[in-house]
Amino acid sequence: MNEQKVNVDFGGRTITIATGKMAKQASGAVMVSCGETMVLVTAVALKSAKEGQDFFPLTVNYQEKAYAGGKIPGGFFKREGRPTENETLTCRFIDRPIRPLFPENFLNDTQIMATVVSADQDNDPGILAMIGASAALEVSDIPFFGPIAGVKVGRVDGKFICNPTAEQLAASDLEVVVAASRDAVIMVEGGAAEISEADLLEAIFFGHASVQPIIDAQIELRKQAGVPKREIAPPAVDEALGAKVKELAYAQMKDAVRIRSKQERHNRISAIADETVAALEADFSGRGAEIKDFLDGFEYELVREHILKDGERIDGRDTKTIRPITSEVGILPRVHGSALFTRGETQALVAATLGTSSDEQRIDSLYGESRKRFMLHYNFPPFSVGETSFRLAPGRREIGHGYLAERALERVLPKHDDFPYTIRIVSDILESNGSSSMASVCGGALSMMDAGVPISAPVAGIAMGLIKEGDDIAILSDILGDEDHLGDMDFKVAGTSTGVTAIQMDIKITGVTREIMGKALEQAKEGRLHILGKMAEALAAPRTDLSPYAPRITTIWVKTDKIRDVIGAGGKNVRGITEATGVSIDIEDTGKINIASTNKEACDKAIKMIRDLTAEAEEGKLYMGTVRKVMDFGAFVEIFPGTDGLVHISELDTERVKDVTDILKEGDKVLVKCIGIDKQGKIKLSRKEALGAVLPE
């Protein structure tokens, strides 16, 4: 097949989607280009599902090749290794909008691989990879209810921007990724600087409108180069078995789904399943999986019906009520800041740690090295849901949840010049029954306030849900885990009392209109304000003092030409200061020096040593110096470390001096006065004019 391509204008730039030239043995393959950024995306699905497969095994991989940016990987092996955090997050951005668009009964192993093969500084390869995933599926024989496309939305000076550059993003008050189909928004994720719900809604639908040309281009490419889709047989449903399961278990399931305790409810539903399978073993041997599928369908139907018709949820709440909330701070005595945030059966233990610039995370990417001073790490141990598992590194879900909570909090952080600390937050989920990432936001804000971080405002998060059957709609505040699983939308919103700082939305159905989203955002705001009020009962504002175990950072400035004097040859001077005082010192090219220590006296001593190294003599001032060298014509006196001045023999005493050694010897301490500095910077000192004077403290 010859190469086929389509070009489309996208936010003032041209995107090209091409197929038929590379990776032709994949089910579908496209090269998506914009500027000098190029991403190869392939889609492959096995010809049949594995025997006994009961879920859709979709895998998405995204990799940024070092050569794409003209770099050679670091490390001993000099090749790409485990995925970076950015690669993991991009995998999730690609996975989430396409996963709901495969047929329910398509269970073949499917893999999407996106490889960045060329990268410039202006065009986001992650967005191109998302577009490429949809396009590769469109031209393949894999059944897929697409196409979809993604866009990053920013706003500068009140104007929305499609796929902003790095420079524009730096000035933008929001950064939101929107994935959408022709008719619907499917996924939203991003952060914002406390913007209003109305502005956020505008941004989402600006994104939806922006992707339409990309969707048109994919449809055109499919016409040019697509192959027929595979025929997928509709799932066989045994009506007789279904009727028998309903007869035995439907009434029991109706009672079970109203049990309010998560563990008791799950245990009861599991027991009903076991009893039903056992009861039907004689007539329907080996059909346990099908029986459980029917029971899952009953649960789905009963929970949704109860909410829509009766307005009552699984745990007895109405649609707007938030679960009981308790917050405690300062519960870990040696930790710089800590909080225990509990909402219903979801609980997060959150710790904040303050560090110096040496603790910043260094990130090596295609675009060079960057540093990160704020980190939030989210951990989801198996005991939080009463399970066991073998845990090594954090999974994609943990990285994604941590990133969302991090974005929610980073907009309220103080400026680095005002609070020069590196901040690490760790959220350990101790119990989980819905919205644990939003519990991490609440606990994260409280832990920072407990640590004395002067955040501009407290932040709270809430997870919203949606049940929709035809025109019947229920928007749910503070959803449970089961409501997330059985509902049509998972909508997480975090923010302050003023506005939204982060959002994550995944929609599983079509027909979620702008009006529904607007209502969900307003209902989320009501819930967020309620949660903020509950948090304020534990701690309303940041503490004014840091923990005694946190480092105190003092900032001083020196002239840039004095930086080398502070560092010394081979780092001798700065190393000597740290060894003598035990402090941590960070020196910036601007002349800014941060001194960190838990001991104030050590910090003061280090500051004095730095001041001595960088001090400059001033005419008319007195100095206590040390005689370093005696000559026939006078003595050289060190008034600062490394800074000498000459006391001429005529300036030693009021009387005539025949021999310098009659007055001074090497190593003597002597009070001198600066009487002049010549054009070459040579310092003239006088002992004579300092006689009888007292050095001010």
UniProtKB/Swiss-Prot annotation:
Instruction: Please tell me one Gene Ontology term that the record gives under cellular component.
Output: cytosol
**Record carries keyword Transferase:** yes
User: Is this entry keyworded Nucleotidyltransferase?
Assistant: yes
Q: Which InterPro entries match?
A: ExoRNase_PH_dom1, ExoRNase_PH_dom2, ExoRNase_PH_dom2_sf, KH_dom, KH_dom_type_1, KH_dom_type_1_sf, NA-bd_OB-fold, PNPase
- Cofactors named for this entry: Mg(2+)
Residues reported in the UniProt entry to bind Mg(2+): D484, D490
Q: What is this protein called?
A: Polyribonucleotide nucleotidyltransferase
- Describe the family membership recorded for this protein in Swiss-Prot or TrEMBL: Belongs to the polyribonucleotide nucleotidyltransferase family.
